[in-house]
Structures are given as C-alpha cells and as structure tokens.
Amino acid sequence: MSFTFRQQIIWDRKNSPAVAPIRYLPNTELIFWLTKTPCQPNFERAKSPLFVGEVWQFSAKPNPLHPAPFPEELPTNIMMCIKDKTEDFVVYDPYAGTGTTLKVAKSFGLKYFGSEINSNYCRLANETLNGTLF
C-alpha cells in the first residue's frame, strides 16, 4: 500500500506537554497528511482560522488514561475539511491510543481503522468506540 505525502502539520500543545520521563518534555506533535488518491479539502469548513495554517496551537486537557492525549477538535477539524469524500475516504490512525481519532471518524460516518501496540489502549479504544469510556 503506498501513499502520497501531502503535508506535515505541527501541533503546538502550548502548555500541555506529553508526559515522557525518558526525554525532554515534547510540546509538539506531528500530523502527516497522506492520501492514496488526490484529495481537495474545503478549508472554508475549518472550525477556526487557527486550523488552516501548518502550525496549530492549542492545549490538550489532561487525561489520566493516556500520557499524550489530544482533544477531539484536532481530528474533527481535519475531517470537516474532507467530509464529502465519505464513499471512498478511510481514516487510518497508526497510533490509535484511546481511540479519539477513530471516534471522530465514526461520528462523521467515515470508514476507519487503527493500530495500537499497547493492549490496554486497544481495550480503551474499543470502549471509546462502543460509547462506554467517555
């Protein structure tokens, strides 16, 4: 399976760095926009003008279930800009964590799948998708 790299987006977590006792506290995360086919997003749908540049700055709320949580607004904004492509659009989250991205994809009626190496997070993601966690 091959993908075309479209853009890298940087999420500046502001004052909410991910907890990582093994390295300097990371306060940014990278988002890679990859597509299999050409895709023309509608940036006018973005919930905020802060989300149309390549650096997004907003804080995450602490989550005791995961050391690097992010709010639903992050995947929501991306999916709002491409939501017309529901028939062939698939969301893949290679680091699914507690399932936030998958939950948002499900709410948009998009096809989705995720990968997660940590079995506890897999369980939490399933609970998120089944509506029993959050």
Language-model segments: residues:
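Core catalytic lobe of class I
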Residues: 1-124
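Short, conserved SAM-binding/catalytic segment
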Residues: 107, 126-134
